[in-house]
Amino acid sequence: MIQLFDYYNQETQDLHDSLLAAGYACPTIVIEANGFLPDDMISPYTYFLGDEEGVDHPLFFNQVPVPPFWEITGDHQVARVSDMGEERARIHYASQARGRLVKQVDWLDKKGQLRLSERYNKQGRCFAKTAYKSGQEAFNTTYYSTDGQERIVENHVTGDIILTLDQEPLRIFKSRVDFIRFFLERLDLDLDHILFNSLAYSFLVSHSLTGRAGQDILFWQEPLYDELPGNMQLILDNSQLRTQTIVIPDLATYEKAMSLAAADQQQKFLHLGYHYDFKRDNYLRKDALILTHSDQIEGLDTLVQSLPQLVFRIAALTEMSPKLLSMLSYKNVVLYQNASLKQIEQLYLESDIYLDINHGGQVLQAVRKAFENNLLILGFEQTLHDRHYIAQQHIFDSSQPAQLASILEEALCGVEQMRSALQAQGRHANDVPVSLYQETLQSLLGGQHG
C-alpha cells in the first residue's frame, strides 16, 4: 500500500495524518518536487538527487544570491529583489507560519516577464530551475544532484523526462506517468492499494495499473460545481478500474456529489472526514487572541466594552499604529507589537478563544493554528480568512458585534457550553473519531497495513 499525492498542501497533510492515526503508516509519495516535504514523504524528483547532508538549514530571504548592488526587501508576505528601483525577482516563502524561509525565487526580465524560477529546499540548496519561454509558459525544468550535476530534465512542451544516473544508461520517459511508474518499481513498493487525492497524475498512475490486481481509493478534497469531473465520471462508469471508491471528507461536497451522480452510481461515494490531532484541551480561560497586520479590527471597541471580563490579546509582527495603541486605555486589552514567532506560539497556549475579526491578510495561518490548539473561533462575515474552521453559528455580520459577544459570553459560562461550541466547530471542519476512521478503512481495505 502507498499514499500517492500530486501536491503537498494542508488537505494532503490532514489526510496523511488521519491515515497515520488510523494505523495506515505506508510509504507516502508526493509527485510535486517540493523541497519542504515532511520527513516521512518523498518526491520521485528529489529522490534521484541524492541525500542531503547535515541538519535542515533553509535559506533566509536576504541570503538569496544576487548581483552586486542589487537590493533585497521583504515583509511577512513576500520579498523582492530590485536593481535601481526596478523589480528583478520575487521571493516566495515556504510557509507563512515558518517565517521568511525561501522556497522559490522567480526571476523577471526587464519587461517584468517571468523567465526563470529557482526552487530551494529546507537545506537551503537550489535543487531545480524552470525556464520560461514567455511569461507563464514553462519550457523545461532541470533538477540538480547534491553535487551540482544535472540529474533530471523535464520538457514541459513534449512531456519527455530525461533521467541521468551515475554508472547507468540514460533513460528517457515519454510521460510523467512513465517516470513515476519507474520510480515506484525501483523502490519495489507494494501497489496492492493506492490511496490518492487527485484526478491528475495520481489517478493516471492508478489508471495505468488497470488489469493488475489491486484496489485503490480516491480521496476527493476539492469543491464540486455543476458537473462531476471527467475522470471522476470515468471511475463511476468503469467497473474494471482499480478505483471503485471515492471518499469525500467534506460533507457539503459529498452531498453535492450525490446530487450529481446517477442513482446506480451513488454507492461508490463515501463520506469520511478527518481525524485531527488537537494539540491541547480548551481550558475555558477568558483570554481571546487576535493576530493582525492592520489596525482595522472590526467591532473591537464594542467587544472590549461588552466583555470586560475577557482579556483581548492583540499581536502584530510589526509596529502598531497610534490607533491600535490607543486601545491600551482599556484595562482588558494587551498589545504585542513586533511579536516573535515564539511569542505568538505562547499566545496560542495562553488563549482559549480566537477572534477572526481583523481586516487585511491573515497572519501566519492564524485560524488554522487556533483550530489546532482547540481555541473557540468566532468572526465576522466581512473579515473571515478561513471559514473552513469556523462553525456557521459562530459567524456574524459586522453589524452584529453584540450578537457575537453574546455567543462568546454563553460559551464561557461553563464546561458544557464550551464543549458544545467546540463540537460544532469540529463538526463543521469534518472532524471524526479515530475509531470511525479505522472501522471505515478496514471495511474498505480488509484490515490495517503498515
Swiss-Prot record:
It is a peripheral membrane protein. Disruption phenotype: Loss of export of cell wall protein GspB; transcription should not be affected. Non-glycosylated GspB may form aggregates. Keywords: Cell membrane, Membrane. Transmembrane segments: none annotated. Pathway: Protein modification; protein glycosylation. Coiled coil: none annotated. NCBIfam families: accessory Sec system glycosylation chaperone GtfB. This is UDP-N-acetylglucosamine--peptide N-acetylglucosaminyltransferase stabilizing protein GtfB. It comes from Streptococcus gordonii.
